[in-house]
From Swiss-Prot:
UniProt gene name: hpf
Domain of life: Bacteria
Species name: Acidithiobacillus ferridurans
Family per record: Belongs to the HPF/YfiA ribosome-associated protein family. Long HPF subfamily.
GO molecular function terms attached to this record: ribosomal small subunit binding
Keywords attached to this entry: Translation regulation
Function: Required for dimerization of active 70S ribosomes into 100S ribosomes in stationary phase; 100S ribosomes are translationally inactive and sometimes present during exponential growth.
NCBIfam families on file: yfiA (TIGR00741)
Protein name as it appears in the record: Ribosome hibernation promoting factor
Pfam families for this protein: Ribosomal_S30AE
Amino acid sequence: MQITITGQHLDLTDSIKNYADEKIGRLGRYFDHVSNAQVVLKHLPHEKLSNVVDITVNAPGHVFHAEVHDADMYTGID
């Protein structure tokens, strides 16, 4: 599975990239044919829940999408 992790309005550290890669990589345990996943991590400084995690997972015949707003980026990834 190919995982693409990008950031908007924040500096992506190796720690956050590795954490997201590890968590999204676990999808392979549940879905055999996941082809790729796009993870977009955003920081919105003027919002109460300022971190946004947007994940899109592609599998043959299906597209799964989730978006979470949270005060903590790691919690949002979970």
